Amino acid sequence: MSFVPVNPKPFLQGLIGKPVLVRLKWGQEYKGTLQSVDSYMNLQLLNAEELVDGVKTGDLGEILIRCNNVLWVGESTV
């Protein structure tokens, strides 16, 4: 398996309106629909759920995740 670097801004813009999974540096994960991304790469999610160890712990609704807390973002397959 090889690593292919990707420019993050177009990647995130392409995920708008799609379900995403966001993992924070501290281990928490949030799943929801990516509503918007700003120039600092802060993320706004709709219908967000918090996951701890892959288990849903609650519904949060609309949330904003500050860019400096994000470890990675990917399209959610579930």
Curated annotation (Swiss-Prot):
**Molecular-function GO term, any one:** RNA binding
Pfam families the record matches: LSM (PF01423)
For biological process, the GO terms are: mRNA 5'-splice site recognition; mRNA cis splicing, via spliceosome; mRNA splicing, via spliceosome
A GO cellular component annotated for this chain's UniProt record is: catalytic step 2 spliceosome
As for what it does, the entry says: Plays a role in pre-mRNA splicing as a core component of the spliceosomal U1, U2, U4 and U5 small nuclear ribonucleoproteins (snRNPs), the building blocks of the spliceosome.
The annotated subunit structure for this chain is: Belongs to the 40S cdc5-associated complex (or cwf complex), a spliceosome sub-complex reminiscent of a late-stage spliceosome composed of the U2, U5 and U6 snRNAs and at least brr2, cdc5, cwf2/prp3, cwf3/syf1, cwf4/syf3, cwf5/ecm2, spp42/cwf6, cwf7/spf27, cwf8, cwf9, cwf10, cwf11, cwf12, prp45/cwf13, cwf14, cwf15, cwf16, cwf17, cwf18, cwf19, cwf20, cwf21, cwf22, cwf23, cwf24, cwf25, cwf26, cyp7/cwf27, cwf28, cwf29/ist3, lea1, msl1, prp5/cwf1, prp10, prp12/sap130, prp17, prp22, sap61, sap62, sap114, sap145, slu7, smb1, smd1, smd3, smf1, smg1 and syf2.
Could you tell me what this protein is called?
Small nuclear ribonucleoprotein F
Organism, by scientific name, is Schizosaccharomyces pombe (strain 972 / ATCC 24843) (Fission yeast)
- UniProt gene name: smf1
